[in-house]
């Protein structure tokens, strides 16, 4: 029991005892002086207390004794009652409005995540915001309204840059015009927009290719590969490591060719029939000593092992770049994550629901590069904007170690991370229970929308906490006298504040917030299309959606055409003439030692002419639109 409540109880019983003592003392004096039948004057003692102490000291000693005994009896009674109290177990309770205000959950929208509302959407109750905790884990099964109740409301209000995985593209359609009107530069990356092909481009290798230190380039390529290339089983991790070595060597060769793209890495690793001969030629071509050594090692590896390396490299994520659309979407970058804290950017990575799993390597690469860029340095004075990152369908993206590792430190880099998953078991399957618990703990706030699977129901009930329930048992013995033998017993028992049965029956509009080091919160989810605050923001949007312009698409396609024409022209020149590639100062000394390299092996002229014709047709279609 709270110490302040104990003190208040003791004081209350002491005052009651003193009042009773005063009444008895007044009656004693009246009956002693005026007889038993006299009317009691309760003010007599108060009026003449000082004089009576002088004139009637013996009587006043009795008065003091009566008042003292009654006061002591009151204190003793309070102690007895408190000792007689039933055992208390947990004391968890739902946060009150005053507690939430004190804990920083009520305030102006735009700073931190908006989590829910204290009342129905159409009502005037306050919104619940997370200012103290920068990250959130949202557990929401399909159809629970995580998009309308969490993602869209935050995109409509967040003041800063935003990067969101937009499954189905509805977030772009609902919020991009508002964010553009607020001054954000809006980008829509949609590699699988088969219908219109309207997509901005993003190339994660440009950041690495721009590094001056070639040793750091190698390390960054290896880190990048481990972030997005994943095997289905840990038993083949050794083979995947060999594939990653091949990826790194191909990346360094692509940098030397001045074509730093994942598509080029795919072509380097996959081209050629006899892989041993092919990689021997690549070893002769590349000037980087580390890449040369890797290619030579691959050339001396037996064919079965080499095939396993390459096969696992492709199935782990690189094969997606065999698709021309994916290759085009990553050939260059229309935006730079290094600028995301300097000027507000809104980047929507749009993927159709059925494409989330096949596109998981690109999605992992996209967000891993974002997190790595943010953590390159702490924000300076010229980087005032925070960054909101929303990872929807997190359980379908495969393992992202950089998320579990960086969520502990992202706060100091001015980033707010929201992870959305459907169930707890889905996370356990990928990360394991211990890593999942660490992820939950570092999130600070866990937002649950009516769970459906048993593991999540059990997890939520336990996470909310325990409370104490008073149980009264009545019994009677059967006999002739129905009023005889009756008894009543009272006890307390520990129970969940939110029992599992109640979790199963939660209203679909209810949400539960589990907060680190605080009492839980029960509230209502937001419906932006019904809430007056959000509906007003949404309805103010006007104009066309900020899709990539035809001019932007034509500029990118023209660049590809020029590159194709240059390759075709180069193939028509005598193969004996070879231009020395430009190299950094670190490589100049190594160039002389690498003499005797054979001409670069490239695809046929017909293949490039066919590709150029396809690009021309696409360009003509874009120009007509």
Language model: regions and residue ranges:
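Basic- and hydrophobic-enriched, low-structure N-terminal and domain-boundary segments
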Residues: 1-144, 148-151, 204, 466, ...
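P-loop NTPase motor domains
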Residues: 20-26, 30, 127, 132-415, ...
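Short beta-strand-to-coil "C-cap" segments at the C-terminal boundary of structured domains/repeats
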Residues: 118-119, 525-529
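Short secondary-structure boundary/capping segments
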Residues: 178-181, 203-206, 433-436, 462-467, ...
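Short loop or secondary-structure boundary microenvironments that flank
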Residues: 353, 393, 421, 450-453, ...
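Extended alpha-helical interface modules used as scaffolds for assembling large macromolecular complexes
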Residues: 493-496, 529, 535-538
């Amino acid at each position: 029991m709270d110490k302040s409540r104990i003190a208040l109880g003791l004081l209350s019983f002491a005052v009651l005892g003193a009042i009773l003592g005063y009444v008895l003392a007044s009656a004693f004096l009246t009956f002693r002086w005026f007889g038993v039948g006299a009317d009691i004057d309760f003010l007599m003692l108060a009026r003449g207390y000082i004089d009576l102490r002088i004139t009637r000291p013996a009587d006043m000693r009795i008065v003091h004794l009566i008042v003292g005994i009654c006061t002591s009896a009151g204190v003793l009674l309070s102690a007895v009652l408190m000792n007689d109290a039933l055992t208390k177990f947990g004391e968890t309770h739902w946060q009150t409005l005053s507690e939430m205000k004190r804990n920083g959950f009520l305030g102006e929208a735009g700073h931190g995540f908006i989590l829910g509302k204290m009342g129905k959407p159409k009502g005037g109750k306050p919104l619940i915001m997370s200012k103290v905790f920068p990250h959130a884990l949202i557990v929401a099964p399909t159809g629970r309204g995580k998009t309308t109740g969490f993602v869209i409301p935050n995109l409509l209000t967040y003041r800063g840059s935003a990067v969101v995985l937009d499954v189905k593209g509805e977030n772009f359609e609902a919020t991009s015009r508002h964010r553009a009107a607020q001054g954000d530069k809006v980008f829509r990356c949609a590699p699988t927009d088969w219908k219109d092909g309207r997509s901005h481009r993003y190339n994660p290798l440009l950041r690495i290719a721009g590094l001056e230190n070639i040793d750091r380039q190698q390390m960054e390529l290896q880190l990048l590969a481990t972030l997005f290339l994943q095997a289905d089983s840990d038993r083949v991790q050794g083979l995947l490591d060999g594939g990653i070595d091949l990826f790194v060597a191909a990346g360094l060769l692509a940098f030397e060719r001045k074509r730093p793209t994942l598509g080029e890495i795919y072509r380097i690793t996959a081209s050629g029939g006899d892989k041993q001969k092919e990689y021997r030629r690549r070893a002769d071509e590349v000037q980087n000593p580390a890449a040369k050594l890797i290619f030579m090692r691959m050339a001396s590896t037996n064919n079965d092992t080499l095939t396993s390396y390459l096969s696992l490299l492709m199935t782990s994520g690189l094969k997606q770049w065999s698709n021309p659309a994916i290759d085009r979407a990553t050939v260059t970058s229309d935006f730079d994550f290094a600028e995301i804290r300097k000027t507000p950017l809104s980047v929507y990575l749009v993927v159709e629901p059925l494409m989330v799993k096949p596109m998981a390597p690109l999605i992992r690469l996209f967000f891993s590069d974002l997190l790595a860029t943010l953590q390159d340095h702490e924000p300076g004075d010229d980087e005032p904007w925070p960054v909101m990152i929303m990872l929807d369908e997190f359980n379908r993206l495969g393992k992202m170690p950089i998320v579990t590792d960086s969520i502990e430190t992202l706060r100091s880099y001015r980033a707010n991370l929201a992870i959305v998953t459907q169930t707890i078991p889905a996370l356990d399957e990928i990360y394991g229970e211990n890593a999942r618990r660490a992820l939950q703990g570092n999130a600070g706030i866990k937002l649950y929308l009516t769970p459906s699977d048993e593991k999540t129901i059990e997890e939520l009930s336990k996470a909310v906490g325990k409370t104490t329930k008073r149980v009264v048992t009545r019994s009677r013995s059967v006999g002739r006298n129905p009023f005889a033998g009756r008894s009543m017993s009272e006890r307390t028992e520990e129970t969940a504040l939110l029992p599992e049965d109640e979790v199963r029956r939660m209203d679909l509009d209810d949400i539960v917030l589990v907060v680190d080091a605080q009492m839980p919160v029960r509230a209502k989810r937001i419906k932006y299309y019904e809430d007056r605050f959000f509906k007003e923001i949404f309805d103010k949007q006007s104009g066309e959606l900020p899709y990539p312009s035809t001019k932007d698409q034509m500029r990118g396609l023209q660049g590809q055409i020029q590159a194709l024409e240059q390759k075709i022209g180069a193939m028509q020149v005598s193969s004996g003439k070879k231009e020395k590639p430009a190299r950094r100062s670190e490589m100049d000394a190594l160039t002389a030692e690498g003499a005797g390299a054979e001409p670069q092996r490239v695809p046929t002229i017909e293949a490039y002419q066919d590709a150029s014709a396809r690009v021309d047709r696409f360009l003509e279609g874009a120009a007509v639109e």
